[in-house]
Amino acid sequence: WTKDFMDNMQSEINATLSSTLGVETRECSGQDKIDCSKLHSTFKLPIEYVNPEELHPLSDVVTQDLELVKEEGELSVYERLFQPTNILGHNLIDDWKKQFTSNKQYLLDTQRVISETIPPASFFDNSGTSDQEFVKNWEELKINHDTFLEKYGFIEFSMLESFNRSPLFLQLLSVANMMSPVVSLMLPFIFLIFPFIILKVRGIPISLNTYITVLMDIAKHHFIGKMLNNVKNISPTNLIYMLFGTGMFFYQIYQNIISCKRFYRNVQKLSSHLMIFKDYLGHSIESIEQFVLKHKDKTSYLEFCRESYRHKMVLIDIKRILDVHETSDFSVFDIGKIGSLLKNYYELHSNQEYERSLRYSMGFEGFLDNLRGLKLHVSKKAVYNVGINDETAC
């Protein structure tokens, strides 16, 4: 009942926010091709939502003169101001230096945002996952599509790629991949046992001669049958053939075992990745929700809150999919869950709507990290609000 109560509360909050913000759809804005050059490519700072006529770009010359950027190894003004503590916060520094605004309402609202916001602790501080590990997991998820399909044993033929979204099909395919070494090892024993079954079914008395006759007939087109046949007519050529065939047989078994172990390790890895993304999504959803609830009434932040809310709803959809995964420690006892694991990992890899919202959440996490650094300066009285009124020139 506790889970149902929390779900109902979440639904009430979402309904209230949707009504207040005037958001009627879960579709996120910007359906163009995703820019993969930076992690937070779909995220825009609140300043970028103000009237374009009141948004003024900063040239590279000005940013250099103001020391807003520095050479590698030196700290810029923005880095000293925001004190980024992780990769996501550091990556956002370049976005701050691109423009400034003369919109007084935005400046006043931003002062209130800084004073009223209590940013939650960074996901990387409490989760046991470092920012480098998180980014590495993301890069592995977003590797080249063909490489991704081959690495995790998905169907590579484009006309059949829809099967990669079928948990049942992926489960059967995965079990077949992992069983191939066992089947290869058992094949000789199957050949040796099968003649007994045939003779028994036919009601033929079992003797050594009848057994060998049936065995040779069954295995005549297989390596084992040919090897048994060559035993009768041993010669240097047949001996070489037997040794080569035996070597190839065991080499095939070895390759199957290596392939099976590699596949198992990859499944263990993606299981761990999904749990990290699941925990991150829970943190990100809560962070966005708290910010939107706190600042949705600020005029110049309304569009930013709307966009954040839209992406939050998509993040909720993603987390709902990942909630079925309960542990990152995949073992042989979890083999029955492989189909679901692979399907969900493929969905995260290929679904562009999910990618847009995940990239947006990384930008939002970086934004909160910058806000934490700025708040620290304010608390130490190293940074003060400037007075703004109707007579103040902007």
Can you describe what each PLM-predicted range is?
Residues 1-324, 346-374, 385:
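Conserved amphipathic alpha-helical "coupling/scaffold" segments
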Residues 333-334, 339-347:
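A membrane-cytosol interface segment of integral membrane proteins
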Residues 375-394:
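Long, charged, glycine-rich C-terminal linkers/tails
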